[in-house]
């Protein structure tokens, strides 16, 4: 046999046969290999393009027309690979992990396959979409974890493959290595980084042992023994397994937000361990987990509500096992309950618990995001405008109630989950419910970005406040919302009266009555243009509602429900300059 796929072969060694000539075959690898004689001889394909080539489509009508998918996106050729067009108007980012800070708007940063780490605001305060040019490169190599200092939004900790961790000062632009150098340690391709929820100067970093820095990576201490199985059959000198991929490493670490030093760790060879005293003593929990596959531990999530509660997920796709594995413990790992329930067949990459509602859980798997409102008894797909794709990481922004999903192939998606926080089985039995609206900042629009029109634009959040509501049954009429500034009604909105969960958007505006002279001038102007116009458009104008507090009344089926909401002043725009 002849090895032609390169070494290491990696996971994308696809074979593609030219539909117009069976003797022409391509093998995808770090570089694409090609044969023109049915495999007798092989050479590197004459593609002056690509690198880590994952996918190849060959036009059945024209073999010179091909589309190549690789680590930096995609390329299109019409001349057999001599020249390539690289379209940048598609969202094709392969994220491994995502983090956020507490600035306004908050920043999102994530690591990309062979494309470094990048950071941008979650919305464009200048108005319009999030431009390609508004992303900043904040790390190199294969980008992995990105975790912010949540106290002052100054420091970003990130890494490239196999653990080279750096600290970026977002105020000064200084970037420096803070890697703990010990050649005997093994780091995963995507080695976990954790900023302690109790002290933002304290950082944890996973190798085969857990590392702790008491002060921003200036120094490190080892706070565990080897937490993996360390099977000699999987280990080589400084590496694990075949090729250049290290094995027997920590893949996930979390600290209880309720108890300092209560740490959970999972490894790629199936170990799950916990310490209650910052690493002095560790307990191996494998035997307590029912039907434990001892596969790659994709996530351990410490509960925000109970220090003895945690969640656990495994991924078995490397073992050709595509069952979902999700567990929950309420007694520090002594017993575990399977909560995979009706999740589809497919590996689970991440699980998150909401910080306000302990029964509100989210899972990211190979198909997208799934939500449970009953603590994992049942799961529902969150599709909406999100295509089917693997979700490798998720975070929940505690102030904004946004779910941030990092996909491995279609970029980052953000969903407003504020309404879901209140959803319970009891609420769904009600006739109607008006969810608590979240206040919104009216951004100062300044510093517009120059951009290329052919680049991809991300979506900003609407410059509006959503009003979410639920109806247990059809009303046969619209639902109305009236916004009051004090005692004065300033805006009226209508929404669907059908059963289900709905949303209407208030554009943070107020209806202002024009003077008689202004109304007459408008009538004359529309008459000159020969246009018919509604009398309300003549009588009222729409103006931005001022910064301040408002009352919203929802009327549904003759019943009224009242909520408060605020428009916040943009006090942070100078920080963004």
Sequence positions of predicted segments:
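Glycine-centered tight-turn motifs at strand-turn-strand junctions
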Residues: 293, 489-543
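Surface-exposed loop/edge segments in extracytoplasmic proteins
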Residues: 174-177, 378-380, 487-493, 561
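Short beta-strand elements
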Residues: 559-576
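Short acidic/polar inter-strand loop motif in beta-rich domains
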Residues: 512-515, 555-563
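Surface-exposed loops/turns
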Residues: 92, 388, 498-499, 546-547
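Beta-strand-rich binding/interaction modules
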Residues: 166-168, 465-488, 549-553
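Beta-propeller blade termini and top-face loops
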Residues: 1-455, 462-466, 470, 474
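Surface-exposed coil/turn segments at beta-strand junctions on protein surfaces, enriched
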Residues: 305, 460, 474, 497-499, ...
